[in-house]
Amino acid sequence: EEQDIRSMGGVWKKIPYTYILMIIGTLALTGFPFLSGYYSKDAIIEFAYLKGSTVGYYAAAVGIFTALLTSIYSWRLIFKTFHGKYNNKKNNLSSIQESPLIMLIPSCLLAIGAIITGILFKEIFIGSETGFWNNSILFLQITQHDHAPTWLLIITPLIVIVTIPIAYYLFVKNEGILKNAVLKNQLLYNFLINKWYFDDLYNFIFVEPIK
């Protein structure tokens, strides 16, 4: 079975149910408004910012940046897999079939959870009903109450929405932009594609000496 998304593309019409379920999962993962991932991601960034310290501001900035990266690579997966031109030279497009019910039914349940659990349980986990946790989480007496600035409330949903057309343009409509960027920054590309060479370093320090 093919696992390289570079050898896929243009298959959404062949597996429409899988495509729709993947879209729902991606929207939830990236923190699209009112889906399950939106409430947790937004709360983490808000709490970090409202810490009011250098570390808190730094953590919020990192959270926003990682939200951007998550959205880009998640939509890259969608567009490279389901859109664009079919690139698999081993298997014909006609051979691709929808997943069986034994896979679709659990996926549908997960998709339903991604849609409704955030709305249903947000008050229990991060809202006014946090008494659900009883004595497992203890708070000191509240002396002041802060509100997150408006820009912080809208920046994550804005990133999620804006990166969808950007990712489509970069990974489907005009892939040449990224290919040219790779050619011009080959050293950086190799450094990143090799995961900062951590695996090589790990093998050199820990694995090779004990062989």
Where are these regions (language model features)?
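Membrane-interface segments at transmembrane helix junctions and kinks
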Residues: 7-20, 39-66, 88-211
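Acidic glycine-/aspartate-rich tracts in secreted/extracellular proteins
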Residues: 27, 85-88
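Alpha-helical multi-pass transmembrane bundles of energy-transducing inner-membrane proteins
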Residues: 1-5
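Transmembrane alpha-helix interface/packing and boundary motifs in multi-pass membrane proteins
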Residues: 25-34
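Residue-level signal for the membrane-embedded core of alpha-helical transmembrane segments
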Residues: 69-76
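Residue-level hotspots within pore-lining transmembrane alpha-helices
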Residues: 28, 66-69
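Membrane-spanning helices that line or support transport/gating and their immediate boundary helices
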Residues: 77-81
